[in-house]
Amino acid sequence: MMVFAFWKVFLILNCLAGQVNMVQVTIPDTFVNVTVGSNVTLLCLYTTTVTSLEKLSIQWSFFHNKEMEPISIYYSEGGQASAIGQFKDRIIGATNPGNASITILHMQPADSGIYICDVNNPPDFFGKNQGILDVTVLVKPSKPFCSIQGRPEAGHPISLSCLSAFGTPSPVYYWYKIEGNTIVPVKESFNSATGVLDIGNLTNFEKGYYQCTAINSLGNSSCEIDLTSSDPEVGIIIGALVGALTGAAIIICVVYFARNKVKSKQKNLNSSTELEPMTKVHHSRQNEAIPAGGIQLEGTLPSSIHASHNTEPTTAVLEPEYEPNPPLETATQPDPEPEGSGPMPVPETEIQLQPEMELEPETEPEPEPEPEPQPELESELEPDPQSGVIVEPMREEEKETVKA
């Protein structure tokens, strides 16, 4: 208290002596409202006891309502001025003495907040050198968004909501019902600050079109919503339609995959069929010397032997080692004749030969005395390993003749 009293006395004495230097800042309008997109001039006037303005400095600071620390947006000293931050190229400062006002161009909602004007002119260190302004950017309500809470079916409780994303000052909401060409206020209670309309259990009386209007000092905006109680039969029809479409889609998919599978199998079958003729040709060339039905070779004994024995030409039958399919009937061997009756003529057997294959004639052997006939003994000729055939048994007399 003693210090404060001392300074008070000191200032009074200096004023009486005419030696006190002071700066006085005046703010004509501390509350300013401006429409979004328009320009605004923030007035700040000052007085100083120092005649020289060479050291005069003017600074404007701003902080948004949500921020705690002010930021410098404009500074001028010795006639040199500059704008800073989000207001760069948007601020024009006054140049006439005693006027520290600024004009801000194209105001936006984010420009709403507190502005501080600070003036200093050394050696003026006393007085009120600071002024504060509260600026609000007015915004027309944006088009509200209307929505339904609950199931819009008869007997179910529902409510309607309406909300604008932007609007300064905060808009007030009103609900109306559209009946034909007229709009009438709703009878149900609603909250004008939040825009919620509580309808309760929906009946046929409440169904129809509703309109919500958001209003503030700059204008209004509206939205509409169609509130119609749905018929249960409509839900059944929609469900049946969805089920039918789903079933049809499943059937189409099954048919599509089945057809693709059949086409794939047919393609593989065609590929194997194209390779089959080459395989058959290869087998037929290997079997040209050995027909599938069996091979029979015809060999004729020399004519001198036939003449000496007075016999018919003898035929030797060769058959394959394996049993052909279908089996071929072999020539039936005749019953042996009793001794002394002479050699039995061998019946001629037809032998199938390919035209290209012929037996080379053997060298004619010298005739030998005719042996006495003996009982027939069955024997097998050794198969030719190269031809893969079996020689049919011959009579003993024929063997002796061939060996000779």
From Swiss-Prot:
Residue spans of biased composition, Polar residues class: 301-314
SUPFAM superfamilies on file: Immunoglobulin
Sequence intervals crossing the membrane: 234-254
Modified residues (Phosphoserine): 271-272
Compositionally skewed regions (Basic and acidic residues) per UniProt: 393-404
Pfam families: Ig_3 (PF13927), V-set (PF07686)
Domain Ig-like V-type: 23-133
Region Disordered: start-end pairs: 266-285, 298-404
Biased composition regions of type Acidic residues, renumbered to the chain: 357-383
InterPro entries: Ig-like_dom (IPR007110), Ig-like_dom_sf (IPR036179), Ig-like_fold (IPR013783), Ig_sub (IPR003599), Ig_sub2 (IPR003598), Ig_V-set (IPR013106), Myelin_P0-rel (IPR000920), VSIG1 (IPR029861)
Carbohydrate attachment residues: 39, 201, 220
Signal peptide stretch: 1-22
GO terms under biological process: epithelial cell morphogenesis; maintenance of gastrointestinal epithelium
SMART domains hit by this protein: IG (SM00409), IGc2 (SM00408)
Keyword line: Disulfide bond, Glycoprotein, Immunoglobulin domain, Membrane, Phosphoprotein, Repeat, Signal, Transmembrane, Transmembrane helix
Gene3D superfamilies, per database record: Immunoglobulins
Disulphide bridges: 44-117, 162-212
Superkingdom field: Eukaryota
Bilayer topology annotation: Single-pass type I membrane protein
Subcellular location(s) of the protein: Membrane
Cytoplasmic side: 255-404
Positions on the Extracellular side per record topology: 23-233
GO CC terms in record: basolateral plasma membrane; plasma membrane
Segments forming domain Ig-like C2-type: 141-228
Protein name per Swiss-Prot or TrEMBL: V-set and immunoglobulin domain-containing protein 1
UniProt organism field: Rattus norvegicus (Rat)
Taxonomy of the source species: Eukaryota, Metazoa, Chordata, Craniata, Vertebrata
